[in-house]
């Protein structure tokens, strides 16, 4: 018998004689170390983002949750429906369609909070949307998957990792709450922390993508259709989220916030669900899709950020946004404008 055709017993994903992700000791150690480091860094970044959240505004979004409702409709209405349409349109395999839908049903990721800061978004709305979408995902993910996946698979076979969702919620709420307290007690120190954290957050987003590429570099053999869907999906999320928020009468800075919350998904949660729910043979077909989505959602978010910065430099202050903020918000200057001296309310 030809031993070369035997799958490596240490492989993590195998199909017959195909081993697409043999796990070396280096990969195993790197995975544990980087997961630990990234988790700690993410908690610190979310703490710094909390330093830009004001309690009375955060509670105001919960009492008058129009922005949160729009975000909810985008997160658990637009994204699953878009995933379903793309899956049918491209005629992908049932197991691949299910993974696309799992990605679309995931709540927003913490990267959206970091990007919302950089595009002068509503940080209070961003954090409240991420918190609410993660909490609501406990019920909405099973419901959306039941509705959209039953033409391909029994939704009961999909394992929802409620412990991971709970961990994500705790990892978001606790650091942000501490940051809010620091902002309340020591606003000057909070400004410094926010500046450092916003830069660290931008670096962290890139670092997560690079680490993912290193850890799963041998799993990049995947059907071209999934590459195309992974490219279109985040663009659709950003565009449709922005459009729906604008149709709902939200001001421009909140439209940017909702767009980011819609397009930037929790890809780590999707990867966890995929690994818990599928056999090694099926994983061979879909394992890399969450990472593909993650790369393109970050890439397009960076493009949008660059376009926004260029627009600000070319056009200066936006009088339309100033009028909208005066008419619709009637809120005092937030800590974001105070922190970034040159930014005025009309730019938010």
Swiss-Prot record:
Where does it live in the cell? Membrane
Q: What is its main location?
A: membrane
Per the record, which residues fall in region Disordered?
322-348
Q: Where are the transmembrane segments?
A: 29-49, 82-102, 127-147, 158-178, 196-216, 225-245, 285-305
* Residues on Extracellular side: 1-28, 103-126, 179-195, 246-284
The record's catalysed reaction(s) read: taurocholate(out) + 2 Na(+)(out) = taurocholate(in) + 2 Na(+)(in); cholate(out) + 2 Na(+)(out) = cholate(in) + 2 Na(+)(in); taurochenodeoxycholate(out) + 2 Na(+)(out) = taurochenodeoxycholate(in) + 2 Na(+)(in); tauroursodeoxycholate(out) + 2 Na(+)(out) = tauroursodeoxycholate(in) + 2 Na(+)(in)
Q: Molecular function (GO) terms listed?
A: bile acid:sodium symporter activity
Membrane topology label:
Multi-pass membrane protein
Instruction: List the Pfam families hit by this protein, alphabetically.
Output: SBF
Cytoplasmic face residues = 50-81, 148-157, 217-224, 306-348
Give residue numbers for the modification (Phosphoserine). Answer: 335
Checking InterPro entries in the record gives: BilAc:Na_symport/Acr3, Bilac:Na_transpt, Na+/solute_symporter_sf
- Found in which tissues? Mainly expressed in ileum and kidney, lower expression in jejunum.
Q: Which residue intervals are annotated with compositional bias (Basic and acidic residues) in the record?
A: 322-332
Family per similarity comment: Belongs to the bile acid:sodium symporter (BASS) (TC 2.A.28) family.
The record describes its quaternary structure and partners as: Monomer and homodimer.
Q: What is the role of the protein in this entry?
A: Plays a critical role in the sodium-dependent reabsorption of bile acids from the lumen of the small intestine. Transports various bile acids, unconjugated or conjugated, such as cholate and taurocholate. Also responsible for bile acid transport in the renal proximal tubules, a salvage mechanism that helps conserve bile acids. Works collaboratively with the Na(+)-taurocholate cotransporting polypeptide (NTCP), the organic solute transporter (OST), and the bile salt export pump (BSEP), to ensure efficacious biological recycling of bile acids during enterohepatic circulation.
Return the protein name: Ileal sodium/bile acid cotransporter
